[in-house]
Amino acid sequence: MAYPMQLGFQDATSPIMEELLHFHDHTLMIVFLISSLVLYIISLMLTTKLTHTSTMDAQEVETIWTILPAIILILIALPSLRILYMMDEINNPSLTVKTMGHQWYWSYEYTDYEDLSFDSYMIPTSELKPGELRLLEVDNRVVLPMEMTIRMLISSEDVLHSWTVPSLGLKTDAIPGRLNQTTLMSTRPGLYYGQCSEICGSNHSFMPIVLELVPLKYFEKWSASML
């Protein structure tokens, strides 16, 4: 859950998000070291008189500044590609949920159940109860079992949308006429909030997403009560 004056990411709730946080720290350290080196060289150039204005060729320096950036790019690319393949891989999902974006609400269909579908609208500010979050609460939450692989099929009925839940590391475009898929697995129960992340019209900011991750036995009770 985000909070005011937050500087970092939300707490990771899925293995993918944990990998993304590790990759962010890895890349940030590389960027910090490169920036420090560049600033150090600039400071030397500004403070020393040992310059070589007549130097026309320096094979050693050119070799270093060609090979070193290539190595750095490889160190960034390899873990990035690994995470991309992990995010794209879906093996034997335990549950499939179809998500459709509309102007300006979401529809959900549990394809493993008959007649288990609903629309999810934002609760207006005037109808919020004490303790509920403005612009983030919905009338129907997406209840899912924790510690299970869940496949989300995402599309749109009208314009471009984007189904995003930051703490799970999810951001998938909802495109009319196209079915995208992503996978999620939560390591702990709780409420996880997201929003549409693609400008889709005047009420774009009023399309919240609320996932309620619960143990399997509670999910079974909920699904039975919805049928």
From Swiss-Prot:
Necessary cofactors: Cu cation
Residues that bind Cu cation A1: 161, 196, 200, 207
Gene Ontology annotations for the cellular component aspect, listed alphabetically: mitochondrial inner membrane; respiratory chain complex IV
Gene Ontology biological-process annotations: ATP synthesis coupled electron transport
SUPFAM superfamilies: Cupredoxins (SSF49503), Cytochrome c oxidase subunit II-like, transmembrane region (SSF81464)
Annotated binding of Cu cation A2, by residue: 196, 198, 200, 204
InterPro entries hit by this protein: CcO_II (IPR045187), CcO_II-like_C (IPR002429), CcO_II_C (IPR034210), Copper_CuA (IPR001505), Cupredoxin (IPR008972), Cyt_c_oxidase_su2 (IPR014222), Cyt_c_oxidase_su2_TM_dom (IPR011759), Cyt_c_oxidase_su2_TM_sf (IPR036257)
Entry-linked CDD domains: CcO_II_C
Keywords: Copper, Electron transport, Magnesium, Membrane, Metal-binding, Mitochondrion, Mitochondrion inner membrane, Phosphoprotein, Respiratory chain, Translocase, Transmembrane, Transmembrane helix, Transport
Membrane-crossing segments per the record: 15-45, 60-87
The record's free-text note on cofactor binding: Binds a dinuclear copper A center per subunit.
Protein name: Cytochrome c oxidase subunit 2
Species this chain originates from: Boselaphus tragocamelus (Nilgai)
Source organism phylogeny: Eukaryota, Metazoa, Chordata, Craniata, Vertebrata
